[in-house]
Amino acid sequence: MKVELPLGDVVDKISILQIKSERIHNADKLKNVHQELTVLKAAWADTDHPSLEELPEWAGLLEVNGKLWTVEDDLRLLEGQQKFDESFVQLARSVYFLNDKRAALKKSINISLGSSLVEEKSYQDYGSGAGSLPD
């Protein structure tokens, strides 16, 4: 099956797979991650688009998706401890802000590369709330 996707979604997916390839240690899971990453990178390389590393948004997606991974890990740890304190609330809120940044990066890729499909979000813009993002 072949499905057309917004280009920003493809780059985002590759960045997530890159992070998974670095952070997952289970050999069976890594095999699947590497297979998917190889297929998507080859498909991207077969286009006329700049390499992933040449995209201005690439480093930003790696950073944001890496932070999301860490936040989700931290949330699951606190959830397991049934610890729903201020730290939990701040981490949970940071997911919205990080996802807003992620959506903006993906949209920037879609626009700059002339993607025929562009994902739109309908969520409220939280604006200056980014100050509460974890480092």
List PLM regions with ranges.
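Extended, charge-rich alpha-helical interface modules
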Residues: 1-135
